[in-house]
Amino acid sequence: MKIGDGPRKLALVGDTHGGPEANTFELASQLADYFRAHPEEVPLSVRLYIIPTLNPDGLALGTRFNASGVDLNRNMNTDLDACPENDWNNHVQGAYGVESDTGGPYPESEPESGLIRDFLLDAAGVIFYHSDGGDVFPAFCEHAPSIALAQTYATATGYRYDRYWGKYNITGGMQDWAGSLGIAAVIPELINGVDADYDQNLAGVQAVLRQADALLPLPEDRVEQGVPVPALIWRYWKAHGGPEFFGPPLAPATLDGAITRQFFERAVLELRPDQADTPYLVQPAPLGRAALAGRALPIAGEGDREGRTFAETGHTLRGAFADYWDRRDGMLLLGLPLSGELDAPAADGQRRTMQYFERGALALYTEDGGVCPEPLGWAALVRARLQDTTAAQQIR
C-alpha cells in the first residue's frame, strides 16, 4: 500500500519471519488500515509504503523460513559495510541458542530478498517489524541516521532502545544491508509473539512522520575513484557487486532527456525515473545486444540437452556461466543469453570461452576457473565519444 508522493520514501515491512511472527503481519495490516483512513498524517515530503508480509509462504506454512527453508533475515548481502561481524553466512544463529544452515546458498539467493533489495533502492528509511523482544535497535555498523531513527521510535513506543540485538549475532540481516547503503533502518521487536502492539507502534510511526525531514535522509551522491556517482546509480552499483561486477566509473553521469546515464568499465547504468518503485529504476543498458549488432550467431541445436535453454532466444546456459548468472541475479543484470558458448578473443587478447547476453558478456578464465564480465562499458564509451558531433576529433 502506498500513501503520498513525497521524495522521502519510508517503508514499513511486516512478517519477515512468517508464521511465528504473524503478529507483525497483523500490526502492519492495522497500520495500513489506519493510514489509508488518515492520509493527511503523511507529510508532503514522504511517500509511505506498508508491506504486511515479506514472507507469505512462511506465514501460510507456519514457519520462520520461506518455502525453500531459508531465513530471509539472514539472506542479505551484509558484506557491504565496514563491520565483518555481520557478514552474510550460510550458518546462522537464532533464538534459544539454535544454530542452522539457513542463511541460503549465497547472499540474496531468494526471490523475496531480491524484491526487497530492489524496492528499497531509493528508500530514505525502512522499519522491519519482528517479535519478540520489546526493544528497538538500528543497523549494526555505525550509521547515525539508523541510530537516530531507532531512538526516536523507541521513545515514542516505550520500547527499550538497544544499540545492538544482544541475544545472538545476526548475519545477513535486512536492517544491516539497508544501513550499508545509507538507508535509515531499524527493527522494532514487539513485546511478545501474540499481540500486535498496535497503539505503541502507531505512536512510533507518527513520531517518525512528524520528524521526517530530520530522520529520513535523502539518498546522497557519492564519489568513486575520483568520479562523482549519482545517489541511486551508486546504490545500484554497490548493491549489485560494485567494482567486482561493474568495474569503476569511467566518467561523470550525463543527462539524456529524463534518463541519467553513467559509463562503468563493464556496463552503462541508466536511471529511469519513469520506473520508480520498480526493480528497473536503475538498469544496465543493452550493451551485449549492441556488441552483437550485425553478427549472425548460431542457435543451440536440439541435440544439446545439457544446461538450461531459454525459449525466448534458443540459447543455453550451462556450467560456470550458469552458476555465475544465477548468483548475480542474471535476468536482472545480464538478461537473456544471446549466444551459445563461443571461442573468441577476450579483453586480455587471449581466445577464451565467452557468452553474450542482452546486457553484457562473460568470459571464462580457465587459469582459475573464474568467470569475469567483459569491459563492454569501455567500448561503449569510446564509441559514444567517437560519435559525439560536438567533440573535436583528431584526423590523421
For each predicted feature, which ranges?
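Short conserved micro-motifs at the rims of enzyme active sites and ligand-binding pockets
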Residues: 83-84, 197-201, 275, 367-368
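Extended, compositionally biased repeat/scaffold regions that form elongated interaction surfaces
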Residues: 218-396
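Active-site/substrate-binding loop(s) of hydrolase catalytic cores
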Residues: 7-13, 19-159
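Short beta-strand-to-loop junctions in surface cap/lid or active-site-entrance loops
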Residues: 1-7
